[in-house]
């Protein structure tokens, strides 16, 4: 991870222009829109839904909570969209690094370094520094983002032909699908649905295998595997590949911005159709196991959103509305870690409790939640104004 701090108007303007040439504003805007949901907006909508005390409010609040197994809520799309956008940014980053003279070996080690940093940040996020290693979540969100992105990034780096990249990504997805289908059928009693609840799903089976193996080597209690879901990390590879293909569409030379938006929309529809076909074959959309249908459906929605953002920003030239999202998107890792390391809810109550007391009690909590979300955005805005971007 490195910290960029730009000072001086002339230098800042030059670096800003260079950065815009290397970045796609629609990707930054969509990344900010994605992270917004876990940067306080989810808590605000949950409190507002409870305060409404009606069916609409209950439905709105439910969308901010993860489904227990099969199904899909808005909040369930945040993680795969983040992985998708990491993949979408890579074609531009790769071209930029090669233009600066980096050899493929150097770029590969930068990929490895980024994965290791994300893995380490994930450990810190999940209280690794308490030194309670047996209960630490090793397969964290950041670790899975880094792993999925690293595999897709290295594939594009070393494969000279795009056709080879496509075949590798299709092979990985097919193998993942077959493993999710066949391993439960081989291990569980006959007649068990392989996509059924987590007790018989492939993620739990693989976790149990790992836990038993580690226990034999290191002794009982070496690691609590209930929440690791190691197998699902492999699914993140496919999500990153989908984002990478979207990025390649945006980077395609000779296509107009309008055509790129149209191709993204067509890609999204194809993925959505694939998700429908998968569901018709008996594979439900299951976020906790990151199963094939979930990969296709979440990828379809992320691609369609990118098509919409690209059409509005890069085709129609309507950029101003995206500024609040770009402020977050330029420091996405920072805002993700912020809520873990800073108690913004307590800070929100400190600054806004007096204002909240003018409202009935259910709405008072909504006001403080809105204040906490506003503080998070203001912190990102301060970093944006100071040209401080913490990137990995």
Model-derived regions: residue spans:
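Alpha-helical transmembrane segments and their immediate juxtamembrane cytosolic regions
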Residues: 1-392
